[in-house]
Amino acid sequence: MVKRYVVDPIVRMWRAARNARPQYPPQDDWELAKGRFNSIVYANVTHKQTGVSFGVSTYHMPCMFRNPKVMTLHSALAATYTMRESEKDGTKNSILMGDFNVKPIDGSYELLTTNNLDENDVFYPIPYEGTEYIVEPPARMVSCYKEVNGEEPDFTNYAKIKDDEPFIDTLDYIFVTENIRVDAVAPLKHRDEVTDGPYPSENE
């Protein structure tokens, strides 16, 4: 006995569209990393009273959390660039700050703060076959807030898009090389203490 099924016209249209969808090659993390045009800003500053100089950079990382290897490459390059420019200016005092779009549990953060990342980690960028690439920056860096408080802030980003659940986590950091002593940081609120948002307000 032959069974007959009635196929909904919408289902037929969906199947046709799916079959007609263009096939894209697998994404290459290195090409993705090179294709971003985020800019880093560097300056050498000198303390007027002591004459001590610092190399200071700020960077806004790509928001590519679905491509963790791309995030690691940009994090490592930002740290390496900052340290190398500082050294050119005759100082080993480097400061790197900005919106990194990585969380404290991410491999990019681990690489910056330990100068080490397991090659099997999903965040570790694998070089092309037959090539070599040292992803580790010249030295590890210290997160100022964790250095002083023993942990990162509860959050630096509190965002809500339409009907999605709010995203609350730490994405912004101030990193310094180990030779810089961090004495204090500005206090930041816990998410439970924030009742007067969103920021900026109409008056800011």
Each predicted region: which residue ranges?
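A long, amphipathic alpha-helix that forms part
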Residues: 66-91
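Internal, well-ordered alpha-helical segments in soluble enzyme and binding-protein domains
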Residues: 39-41, 74, 78, 108
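Metal-dependent phosphoester-hydrolase catalytic domains
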Residues: 28, 44, 83-95, 101-204
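Intrinsic disorder
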Residues: 30, 50, 65-72, 165
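Short, conserved beta-strand edge motifs with alternating hydrophobic and charged residues
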Residues: 57-59, 95-98
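Structured beta-strand-rich core segments of catalytic domains in phosphoester-bond hydrolases
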Residues: 1-62
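Short intrinsically disordered coil segments
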Residues: 3-14, 73-75, 187-194
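Solvent-exposed loop/turn segments at secondary-structure junctions
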Residues: 61-64, 100-103
